[in-house]
Amino acid sequence: MVQNIFWSGFTNRDRTTAIADIEMIINQSGFIIDFKPFSDISISLVIEVQESHIDQLYDALAGYLHMEDFDRLHSVSSQERTIYLNVTFANAMGKLRNEIPAVPG
């Protein structure tokens, strides 16, 4: 059975800018299939990527984020793998609110 991959990183960059940059980095190697923001503190991403591109994706993200260490796979497999990435924004205040409009009726 193929194991999922769990990564975590953090950044001091502006949250909005960082999310856009991280999305561009991921889109070069794989696809974001789900995401969950946690106020302005962090965001969790579910990424699908070919196993042969995982090391490249990690290197690109590690060039942008402070990432935990990862043992390289050195794989040439085209099998799809799932990566769970949690990004913490170091300058967050925890006060982000998402306004939900009232629906009449």
Where are these regions (language model features)?
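Long, contiguous binding/interaction regions
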Residues: 2-105
